[in-house]
Amino acid sequence: MDIPQKIRVMRKSEGLTQREFADIIGISYSALTSYEYGRNLPGLEITIKLFKHPRFRKYRDWFLFDEMEPKAGQVIPALARVGQDETESPHYGSNSGE
């Protein structure tokens, strides 16, 4: 999962609109949409702002390292997938008999 997808998954897991999410972390709506659509990537300053907020700290290790530490309160967002990989067939690996 890439950075834009991770941002979107975090926001949706928290049940927030783009405007609400942007307001909470103190960035503009247009900046957030540019991150979610992959036009820009958040820099270090924005990433620090995001994970300094208590509501989003639990996603830090997942977001940065694709890891989690439940004992430290780290979790993976509830929405593990946003859409299915278009290159993957739901029948991949099945025996079709042909």
Label the predicted regions.
Residues 1-13, 97-98:
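A short, Lys/Arg-rich alpha-helix, primarily the initiator
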Residues 11, 22, 51:
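The alpha-helix within a helix-turn-helix
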Residues 45-61:
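DNA major-groove recognition helix of helix-turn-helix/homeodomain DNA-binding modules
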Residues 60-98:
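Short, charged recognition helix plus adjacent turn
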